[in-house]
C-alpha cells in the first residue's frame, strides 16, 4: 500500500495545487480548480488562488499525462487503470485515486484527484465479532 505522498511525480502545476492540507483537487473544463482542504471535522471547499478556468484541451492533456504515468511505471503495483469505460476512467497512481469523467458520462470534462485522509484498521471500527470473523475467514460476498 502506498504511503501519503508516495506517487510518481505529477505535472508540476498539479503537484503545486496538492498542498499538504489538501485532500481533494477538483478540476472541470470551464471552471477554476477547487480544493477540499483541512483536517477531518474542519474541511473547507475553496478556489485555488491564482488559477484560471481550465480549458477542455488542458483537461485532455492532463488526462493523457496521467495515463502516461501509469504506462511509465509498470514496476509499481499501485499504479494502474482500474476502470476504463466510455466517458469514465478511474486511475490509481500511488496514494492517489483519480477519476476522469467526460461526455457522455458528464456534461464537461472533469478530473478529481483524491488523497487518503485516514488509514484505519478493522479493529478501529465498531463491528460485531461475527462480521469480523466472516471478513477474516475470506468469505465472499458484498460488504456494504
Where are the regions a protein language model picked out?
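Hydrophobic anchor at the beta1->P-loop junction of P-loop NTPases
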Residues: 144
Amino acid at each position: 500500500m502506498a504511503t501519503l505522498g508516495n506517487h510518481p511525480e505529477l505535472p508540476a502545476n498539479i503537484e503545486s495545487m496538492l498542498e499538504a492540507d489538501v485532500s481533494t483537487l477538483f478540476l472541470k473544463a470551464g471552471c477554476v480548480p477547487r480544493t477540499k482542504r483541512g483536517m477531518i471535522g474542519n474541511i473547507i471547499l475553496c478556489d485555488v488562488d491564482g488559477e484560471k478556468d481550465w480549458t477542455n484541451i488542458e483537461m485532455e492533456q492532463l488526462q493523457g499525462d496521467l495515463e502516461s504515468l501509469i504506462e511509465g511505471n509498470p514496476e509499481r503495483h499501485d499504479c494502474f487503470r482500474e476502470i476504463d469505460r466510455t466517458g469514465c476512467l478511474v486511475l490509481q497512481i500511488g496514494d492517489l485515486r483519480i477519476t476522469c469523467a467526460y461526455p457522455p458520462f458528464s456534461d464537461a470534462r472533469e478530473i478529481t484527484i483524491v488523497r487518503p485522509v485516514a488509514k484505519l484498521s478493522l479493529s478501529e471500527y465498531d463491528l460485531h465479532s461475527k462480521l469480523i470473523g466472516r471478513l477474516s475467514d475470506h468469505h465472499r460476498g458484498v460488504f456494504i
